[in-house]
Swiss-Prot record:
Pfam families: PSI_PsaH. It is a single-pass membrane protein. The keyword Transmembrane applies. Coiled coil: none annotated. The chain crosses the membrane at residues 85-103. It comes from Chlamydomonas reinhardtii (Chlamydomonas smithii). Keywords: Chloroplast, Membrane, Photosynthesis, Photosystem I, Plastid, Thylakoid, Transit peptide, Transmembrane, Transmembrane helix. The lineage of its organism: Eukaryota, Viridiplantae, Chlorophyta, core chlorophytes, Chlorophyceae. The gene is PSAH. InterPro entries: PSI_PsaH. Its main location: plastid. GO terms for biological process: photosynthesis. This is Photosystem I reaction center subunit VI, chloroplastic. GO terms for cellular component: chloroplast thylakoid membrane; photosystem I reaction center.
Amino acid sequence: MALVARPVLSARVAASRPRVAARKAVRVSAKYGENSRYFDLQDMENTTGSWDMYGVDEKKRYPDNQAKFFTQATDIISRRESLRALVALSGIAAIVTYGLKGAKDADLPITKGPQTTGENGKGGSVRSRL
């Protein structure tokens, strides 16, 4: 077996990249309001707003009749069978509505019918080629 002489490759030179200047550490600050602050942990109500303004659950805000109405309306669909029936009826209604209105608006070919008259006789297309 003969030894194959391989050429000696020179040492690889590392790819040189241009040097980038070192970045300076910069302190980010926003000029907003007093003392140049966006967010003040010491004064949360003025920072985020007063959320307690909307959290009123007293009877004078929601009268008893309104609460009774929503309780009765949601009591009907609180059972699993009732909820499934509601979903099934809604799906059927959506399909029927699409069949009556949506298919015509989409100009589906099945709603238009045939656009051209066909040839009369047996195998008319084959005979016309002969």
